[in-house]
């Protein structure tokens, strides 16, 4: 991470909302609170979220490293003193007109101060470059904790752990398939693959793969109709079918239909039957296209 003029102009303490004498643990606590509220994953509609999150990360890196923080404090102090001198000079100019000798002395003094400030800035840049090359373990750990907290919040919301009887439940389905925990292929089902399979039935609000149990995921639909269509028609990949069951928001009309397809006792019209056949044909074509695409990507990723 190279130093920027914007970073030198920034008040990192004010950005994190802490005192100048704050200890490392206070800096980290303030970072987690600020970064969690503006994390890009939680603010997809805020174009400045990513920029602010990056600035907070820079602040954490600088203020939790003793050498980088000392260099930054020196630059900050020099700028503050320069601003105070400028203010005093402005007030003095309103009363008297400085003669040439005074201006020459002032220019020499400012030149020396600017050289010192430039040296401090170079020191700060070197410290930040060192942090970039070595890698900031503290920053990575804090960001990992934030990602884990966001993932847990999403899983809790999808599985109904945060219960509120006043909220209207959105339909959620539980997906299962054969997959070994250590297998990187996840049984052929990644998040993108599952989204392609289920988005054709309607808007998917969220989809989370379980981090604890392999071959398990939860999909949340915007409408009950979309969830019903998925339960009735989706079978997944041919070589590794999906088992789909209701988790929340199951309508009364869906009671007794826990597997894809229509029940034996249901009566459908000829038009309904034709629609179902066409949907199954589209599903088969989409699955074949998806399998071919994955095979091409695997071949492209193999060394030649």
UniProtKB/Swiss-Prot annotation:
Pfam families associated with the record: DnaJ (PF00226), RRM_1 (PF00076)
CDD domains per record: DnaJ, RRM_DNAJC17
One GO cellular component, as annotated: cytoplasm
Domain J: 11-76
Gene3D superfamilies cross-referenced by the UniProt entry: 3.30.70.330, DnaJ domain
InterPro entries recorded: DnaJ_domain, DNAJC17_RRM, J_dom_sf, Nucleotide-bd_a/b_plait_sf, Pre-mRNA-splicing_ERAD, RBD_domain_sf, RRM_dom
Limits of the RRM domain: 178-249
Gene Ontology biological process terms from the UniProt entry: negative regulation of transcription by RNA polymerase II; spliceosomal complex disassembly
Subcellular location: Cytoplasm; Nucleus
Domain of life assignment: Eukaryota
Disulfides per UniProt: none
GO molecular function, one term: RNA binding
Residues found modified as Phosphoserine: 112
Region Disordered, annotated ranges: 105-124, 156-180
Swiss-Prot/TrEMBL keywords: Chaperone, Cytoplasm, Nucleus, Phosphoprotein, RNA-binding, Transcription, Transcription regulation
Main location class: cytoplasm
Protein's job: May negatively affect PAX8-induced thyroglobulin/TG transcription.
Name recorded for this polypeptide: DnaJ homolog subfamily C member 17
Record organism: Bos taurus
């Amino acid at each position: 991470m190279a130093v920027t003029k914007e970073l030198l102009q920034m008040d990192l303490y004010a950005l994190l909302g802490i005192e100048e004498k704050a200890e490392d643990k206070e800096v980290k606590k303030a970072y987690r609170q600020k970064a969690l509220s503006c994390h890009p994953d939680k603010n997809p509609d805020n174009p400045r979220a990513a920029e602010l999150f990056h600035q907070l990360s820079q602040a954490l890196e600088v203020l939790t490293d003793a050498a980088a923080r000392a260099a930054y404090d020196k630059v900050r102090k020099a700028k503050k003193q320069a601003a105070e001198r400028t203010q005093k000079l402005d007030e003095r100019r309103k009363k008297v007109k400085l003669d040439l000798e005074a201006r020459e002395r002032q220019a020499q003094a400012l030149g020396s101060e600017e050289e010192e400030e430039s040296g401090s800035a170079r020191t700060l840049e070197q410290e930040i470059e060192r942090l970039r090359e070595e890698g900031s373990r503290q920053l990575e750990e804090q960001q990992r904790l934030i990602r884990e907290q966001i993932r847990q919040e999403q899983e809790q919301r999808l599985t109904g752990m945060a219960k509120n009887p006043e909220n209207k439940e959105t339909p959620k389905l539980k997906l299962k398939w054969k997959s070994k925990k250590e297998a990187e292929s996840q049984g052929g089902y990644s998040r993108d693959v599952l989204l392609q399979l289920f988005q054709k039935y309607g808007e998917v609000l969220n989809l989370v793969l379980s981090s604890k149990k392999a071959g398990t995921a939860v999909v949340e639909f915007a409408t009950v109709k979309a969830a019903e269509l998925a339960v009735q028609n989706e079978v997944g990949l041919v070589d590794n079918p999906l088992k789909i069951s209701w988790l929340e928001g199951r309508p009364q009309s869906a009671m007794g239909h826990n597997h894809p397809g229509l029940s034996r006792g249901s009566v459908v019209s000829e038009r309904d039957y034709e629609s179902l056949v066409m949907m199954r044909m589209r599903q088969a074509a989409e699955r074949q296209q998806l399998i071919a695409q994955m095979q091409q990507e695997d071949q492209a990723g193999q060394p030649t």
